[in-house]
Structures are given as C-alpha cells and as structure tokens.
C-alpha cells in the first residue's frame, strides 16, 4: 500500500515505515502530524482524488530536524575581477510514516 501526498509544494510517494526529509516545519520530536492532502492511494486498486481524496490522511511521526550537505554557488565574470561565492544548507524535518488511512 502506498500513497502520494503533497507537502510544501512538492509531492512524495510514501509507504508505511518509510522515512522522509520534508522541508522544515515547526513540530516537536516524537509528536504526530496528520497530512490530509492525499492525492492518490493504492491498496490493490488505485484511487485518485480531484485534487485530494476526501477522508484520506497520512499520519507521520516526527523523528528530528537536521541540515543537508552544503551546496556551493559560485559566480564569476571573466576578465572583470568579479566573483561571488555563497553556500546554502537546506533545513529539513525528518519524519516516519506510521499509517495511511484511505
């Protein structure tokens, strides 16, 4: 059984027991979060919403927070002695899918 959920403008395919790194949101560790923006559920037969399935939800358990590896942005203009170097680390919230209710 799997579901396709929408969170933070992105879509994720999830199954029970999966771990995900979602965009950072405020939640305490060991707390449960319910997502009701379920686009599709497959439990032997595929159910697709328009755009969401009414009454379906995915329950997530917050494991913790963290940061991704650094991405380096480097810009240079030739022969101008102009350069720019920046770094960026995306913050995420790590969650575990505990149940899918369709």
Swiss-Prot record:
Keywords: Ribonucleoprotein, Ribosomal protein, RNA-binding, rRNA-binding. GO terms for biological process: translation. Coiled coil: none annotated. Signal peptide: none annotated. Transmembrane segments: none annotated. InterPro entries: bL21-like (IPR028909), bL21-like_sf (IPR036164), Ribosomal_bL21 (IPR001787), Ribosomal_bL21_CS (IPR018258). It comes from the Bacteria. GO terms for cellular component: cytoplasm; ribonucleoprotein complex; ribosome. One of its GO terms (molecular function) is structural constituent of ribosome. Pfam families: Ribosomal_L21p. Belongs to the bacterial ribosomal protein bL21 family. Part of the 50S ribosomal subunit. Contacts protein L20. HAMAP family: Ribosomal_bL21 (MF_01363). This protein binds to 23S rRNA in the presence of protein L20. This is Large ribosomal subunit protein bL21.
């Amino acid at each position: 059984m799997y579901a396709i959920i929408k969170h933070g403008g992105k879509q994720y395919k999830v199954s029970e027991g999966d771990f995900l790194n979602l965009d950072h949101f405020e939640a305490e560790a060991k707390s449960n979060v319910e997502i009701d923006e379920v686009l599709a559920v497959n439990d032997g037969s595929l159910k697709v919403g328009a755009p969401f399935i009414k009454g379906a939800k995915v329950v997530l358990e917050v494991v913790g927070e963290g940061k991704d590896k650094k991405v380096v942005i480097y810009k240079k203009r030739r022969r101008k002695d102009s350069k720019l170097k920046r770094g960026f680390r995306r913050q995420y919230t790590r969650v575990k899918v505990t149940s899918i209710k369709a």
